[in-house]
Amino acid sequence: EAGFDILSLANNHTNDQQTTGIDGTLQAVRTVQKERNTLDSPHPPLAFSGLKDTVDDSISVTRITYRGWNILYCAVTEILNSHDASKKRLYYSAPTKRGREALLTILKNARTAYPCDLFILGLHLDEPEYVRTVSEAKKAWFKRLGEAGVDIIWAHHPHVMQTWETITVERTQPVSTDIAIAP
């Protein structure tokens, strides 16, 4: 009822309570999701991303259809507070060259497998807190994410507002052109 329709469950506090906390979060969110997804609910469907049911699951996208739009959503964290076994239950991508290359591959494959009108990535960044300027390295990383097929990068972690910008990237993948703007 507060107006939250899409949740990012991937951040550095997600596994603070280990697997018990992750299981409790998934149970609570799915309970609300089930209530919201009934035909007589006055609220839009509830979607989420960022947690795995088992350690064997991979990062995957959440597919959302809303008012005629096909939307992909994925929430990933680059930082963890707890490095126990529960870390394998989060959508985690190490902020290393290898980790980021692996994430780019996942995102490209998702965009190809599920053609969409909009692809949103919720990314909990490994970056210094309380810094208002956007680093050139961050801009370069975001450009690569755009080239991989992401349309909106919903980045979070610095604890302060940072500037935002739009960029134009070239993609080899086809982009849907039959988009209707909903009122």
Regions found by a protein language model. Give the residues of each.
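Conserved beta-sheet core of the metallophosphoesterase superfamily
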Residues: 4-6, 136-183
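Active-site neighborhood of phospho(di)ester-bond hydrolases with catalytic His/Asp-centered motifs
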Residues: 2-12, 42-52, 121-124, 150-161, ...
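Active-site-proximal segments of metal-dependent phosphoesterases and phosphodiesterases across multiple
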Residues: 1, 116-149
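Active-site environment of divalent metal-dependent phosphoester hydrolases
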Residues: 14-26, 55-60, 79-83, 126-131, ...
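Hydrophobic structural segments
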Residues: 40-49, 69, 110-114, 119-121, ...
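Extracytoplasmic/secreted proteins, especially bacterial periplasmic and envelope-associated proteins
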Residues: 20-31, 102-105, 109, 137-144, ...
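Acidic/His-rich segments in extracytoplasmic proteins that coordinate ligands and/or metal ions
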Residues: 1-45
